[in-house]
Amino acid sequence: MKCELNPRLSSGDWKEFCSRFHFPLEELPNIQAIYKALLPLMESYAYYSLNQDLKEVSFSHYAYGFVTLGNGMDELSELYLNHEQIQEAYIVDCISLMLLSKAYEEFAYVVEEQSGLYLTELSFLGDTYSLDLLPQIYEQLAPDTIQFTEGQMLRPLKTATLILHLDTETHADVKQLCNTCENCKNFSCP
């Protein structure tokens, strides 16, 4: 299945953005201008399956898929780098990380709505589950806007592979269900 996503940063996200990525608040007008410039370039989609067809996943209810922001983020970042505008490229990458987190959240709600189940844990491929699953997931989902390279990488770069554990009973808020806190390098979660 394919679903278009529409992740956006709200006015309340900007202070957290500056704190998380160590930007002074005075930089916000420049950061927000870059954000407005990249929005039309974003083509965010989730490609996913509600089928229980991954033998490596032992849960009785789960979904799996890719979430991507599209090529526009990579292209804008590369454009800035080609013009030696390193800070602007970094800002694009930081905004992309925040938008990708929003896209995960939106994807989780789509899965909950379609499955009639509730998210209990969100896992990134490579954390709980082996990256060896990537070719199998890619083949089963056949995402038309994502490439799987010979080097076992996904393009666009702002693409993640997720496995969502589901249950019949409601649990914590989706923002509290990421399972990588022990190894996480983020200073604060979005």
Please annotate each region the language model reported.
Residues E43, E112, G116, N186-C189:
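Generic secondary-structure signature for well-ordered alpha-helical cores
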Residues Y118-S188:
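Short terminal or interdomain "cap/linker" segment that borders an active site or interface and mediates
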Residues I31-I34, I86, I91, I95, ...:
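Weak global preference for isoleucine
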Residues M1-E84, E88:
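Active-site helix-to-loop segments that bind/position phosphate- or nucleotide-bearing substrates
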Residues F59-D127:
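Conserved mixed alpha/beta catalytic, RNA-binding, or beta-rich assembly cores of soluble enzyme
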Residues S49, D53, D74-Y80, K102-E106, ...:
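Generic local-structure boundary detector
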Residues N30, I34-L38, A103, F107, ...:
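General structural feature for long, well-ordered alpha-helical segments within catalytic domains
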